[in-house]
Amino acid sequence: MGDTASVSEHHESPTVTIVPLHRSHALVAEQQLFQWLKRFKLLMEVYHGLVWQLACTLTVCLLAWLAFPDVQGQCANGIVPALSSIVPVSTLAMLRGFAEFRPHTTNFAHLTVACLLINTGITVCTGFCGERRVIGLSFALVMVFFVLCSGLTYLAGNNPTRWKVIGIGYGWSVIVFYLLLYFSPVLWVSKIYSGLYVLVVTAASAVLIYETLDLIYQRGTLSKNSVCVSVVLYTIVMSLLNMSVAIFSGHVWVQQYAEKHGGRIDGVSLLSLL
């Protein structure tokens, strides 16, 4: 009996701490609130950086265009039409390459300055080649596109059903647009440029949706870098803006090219103006 009592003294039952249910709910709610505030702060930093970069670019462009109002519209034989489509897309590819393969050794502040200088310079040149009303229309359409695409991304989120509805609706809209464009009485050159614009918008939508979903749900380490995300979104906007101006001004450049070459223009010449 004595041995049994001594054993029972040494083997005490473990203590169990019971957390009240209301306290556990409070801890979970506190953690969720902290995560939401952290994500909201990141979103504000990203879009603040985007607005700042767009404001800098547009200010420089307006000053350059107003300082030289007579330099306008004669670019059919130059390289600006091609560069206006190639350079912004190349900077976007460069950004994604650095972000994916060299995220820890890349100074994104320096990369932001480089992208600002490159995209601002090519936008100034594109503005000298395009008409002012075309630039204004392109910028308005790009802003509407950006707000609409971002809003749909926040609305759909990770819900596959919502994305399926959006995809089906957009697909049918594109089909109807191409049918109307095919049977419309406009010139074939305008049909080509209009069809290309739909493809450009579709590609830009896919890239913007992908980047916005990364930002919302922070699916990778790069999405937590506000400087990197803001410059990527800025480059998407500038790519679409420059390509919109190039496409909307394409028929004017084709006409200028034809006038300088005796009314002759072939498919290779047309592609060189894209």
Swiss-Prot record:
A Gene Ontology cellular-component term: membrane
Residues spanning the membrane: 49-69, 75-95, 108-128, 134-154, 168-188, 196-216, 228-248
Claim: ATP-binding is one of the keywords in the record: no
Keyword Coiled coil belongs to the record: no
Membrane topology: Multi-pass membrane protein
Subcellular location as annotated: Host membrane
Keywords: Host membrane, Late protein, Membrane, Transmembrane, Transmembrane helix
Similarity comment: Belongs to the cytomegalovirus US12 family.
Protein name per the record: Transmembrane protein US18
